[in-house]
């Protein structure tokens, strides 16, 4: 395992983000390195509500449920190659204004963007097959 200076731990070959130390993590912007294929912990920072921007690698293919729940992200750009958005991925991200979905996206999980109250615009890709229940519930600004 390898842990960076912000308390984010990756597996030995650095293809999976496996743990985020909530007491050490204090970034407003964080970049997950290229080569990481999965995020297996979430960024719900109980004591730290600073994360405004996350840069995801083009190699990302899997994210755990609740990945960014309650984070103060303002924008999220999901990489091409990602086929599924997990359940509750951005639930209650109250600062989230903009999301860019990849053309490869097939599934949006349950409550993925629920309560993102200022999310105002999202373009759904042509190949999208499934939008689970409440994916956009209470997104009162969505057009």
Model-derived regions: residue spans:
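Consensus positions within tandem repeat domains that build extended binding/scaffold surfaces
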Residues: 42-43, 64-67, 86-89, 109-112, ...
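Structural signature of tandem-repeat unit edges
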Residues: 1-14, 21-38, 47-62, 71-84, ...
